[in-house]
């Protein structure tokens, strides 16, 4: 009886008693808090504390990051949270471990430090250096063959190539292969195979 009273006064349930003394039912939707590793890299800071369902839903759960969903209650920094806790436990633990790193770095780098936990390229980050970034990826304009996009590429030949802004390397005329122009009215009516470079025999048409 003394042991049961002592266990009831504990603020949390020991991990050893989750499955042994109080085994949950097999098909249960109850959420049990599982403690993760204590010393993990910063990139795994958001996965340390999570409510994991036991039973048929234990395979994999959709866990919102708080960046792309509208419901802020499902964000990672709000889980897990005790019903009587006035603060976010997971964020407080993370901030206590990495707060001294943020104070010693510029503001732009602290945002990069926070982005390492949940990479979301939809939200562009602000950095002190002038190079263009999108999310946490450095944006570089590299000419990729065949991947360029021009708004009025179908109007090639209207203006000179050296003055046209829609000139695409390897794809604009005269580099564009035969019978690949967008204007199909300029194609020949005779069938042609570009792979074998074969043309059909000419059809005899009597002239009057």
Swiss-Prot record:
Compartment list: Cytoplasm, Cytoskeleton, Cilium axoneme; Cytoplasm, Cytoskeleton, Flagellum axoneme
Tissue expression: Expressed in trachea multiciliated cells.
Domain of life: Eukaryota
GO biological process per UniProt: flagellated sperm motility
Chief place where the protein resides: cytoplasm
InterPro entries in UniProt: TKTI1
Gene Ontology CC terms: axonemal A tubule inner sheath; axonemal microtubule; sperm flagellum
Protein keywords: Cell projection, Cilium, Cytoplasm, Cytoskeleton, Flagellum
SUBUNIT field: Microtubule inner protein component of sperm flagellar doublet microtubules.
Described function: Microtubule inner protein (MIP) part of the dynein-decorated doublet microtubules (DMTs) in cilia axoneme, which is required for motile cilia beating. Located at the center of the tektin bundle where may function to recruit tektins or stabilize the bundle.
Protein name: Tektin bundle-interacting protein 1
Record organism: Bos taurus
């Amino acid at each position: 009886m003394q042991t049961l009273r002592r266990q009831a006064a504990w603020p949390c349930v020991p991990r050893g008693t989750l499955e042994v003394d109080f085994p949950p039912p097999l098909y249960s939707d109850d959420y049990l808090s599982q403690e993760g590793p204590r010393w993990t890299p910063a990139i795994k800071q958001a996965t340390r504390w999570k409510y994991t369902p036991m039973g048929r839903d234990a395979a994999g759960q959709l866990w919102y990051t708080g960046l792309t969903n509208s419901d802020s209650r499902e964000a990672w920094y709000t889980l897990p949270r005790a019903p009587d806790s006035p603060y976010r436990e997971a964020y407080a633990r993370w901030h206590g471990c990495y707060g001294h790193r943020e104070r010693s770095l510029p503001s732009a780098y602290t945002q990069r430090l926070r982005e390492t936990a949940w990479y979301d390229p939809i939200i562009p980050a602000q950095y002190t250096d002038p190079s263009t970034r999108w999310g946490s990826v450095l944006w570089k304009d590299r000419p990729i063959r065949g991947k360029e996009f021009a708004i009025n590429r179908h109007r090639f030949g209207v203006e000179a190539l050296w003055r046209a802004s829609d000139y695409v390397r390897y794809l604009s005329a005269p580099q564009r292969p035969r019978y690949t122009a967008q204007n199909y009215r300029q194609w020949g009516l005779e069938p042609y195979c570009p792979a074998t470079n074969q043309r059909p025999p000419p059809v005899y048409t009597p002239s009057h």
